[in-house]
Amino acid sequence: MHPTWALGFGDEVWWSRLAQPDQHCWTDTGATTTWHELVPPKGDLDPTALACYGRLVRPQPQAPEQLWLRFVAGRPVSAVTIAFLAWCSTRLAAQGFTALLLIWDNASWHRSQAVQHWIRQHNQQVKRGAVGVRLVVCPLPSKSPWLNPIEPKWVHGKRAVSEPDRLLRADELEARVCAYYDCEREAHLVMPKKVA
C-alpha cells in the first residue's frame, strides 16, 4: 500500500442502555446466570440507545491501528455520514495522509445520492489543494458484515461496557465506550431537523 494512504473500515453501531449483550461467564456447577433487559425509571429522559459512527484506521501494516468514534445526536443518516467523513478526512490529513481507502457496508446512507455527490465534490476540492484526503470507497459485498474487522470490536466492546445490575446513564455509557476503545470524547454529530 502507498505510504501516504490509510486503510479505513467504517461502520455504525447502536449502544443500548437496556438490552444486555450475549455474555459468557463461569458459574458453579448447576448454577445459572441470567441477564435481563433493564427498564428505565419513569421520567428518564436519556435515549434508550446511542448511535455511534466508527472508523478503524490501519495506517500501515506495521503501525498500530486506531479506532475513531463519533456519537450521534439522533440516528445515522446521509447528512451525519457526510459530517463524519469530513471529520475523518481532516484528521487523516493532519497526520500526513493523502488518501483513505474506505471499506464499509451497503447501508442506505452510504449509498445515498447526497453522500456520493459529497464524496465526488470533496475529492475534486482536495485535488485542487483543499485540506483533507481523497476518499476511495470500497463497498463490502451485501450481507457480509464478517468481512469488516470493526464488527468484532463492537461485540467485545458491548460485553466490556455492559452493566448487569443497573441502568447506565447515556453519558456514563458513552464514557465507558470511549474509555474501552481509548478514544477521546468528541462533540456529538447532529442529525438535521428536516430528516428527524
Go through each PLM region and give its residues.
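C-terminal anion-handling pockets and recognition modules
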Residues: 3-5, 134, 142-143, 147-196
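Acidic/histidine-rich, metal-coordinating catalytic segments
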Residues: 11, 97-111, 140, 148
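Extended, low-complexity cationic-aromatic segments
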Residues: 1-87
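A short acidic (Asp/Glu
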Residues: 18-21, 111-116, 150
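Short glycine-/polar-rich loops that comprise or flank the Walker A/P-loop
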Residues: 4-5, 48, 98, 132-136
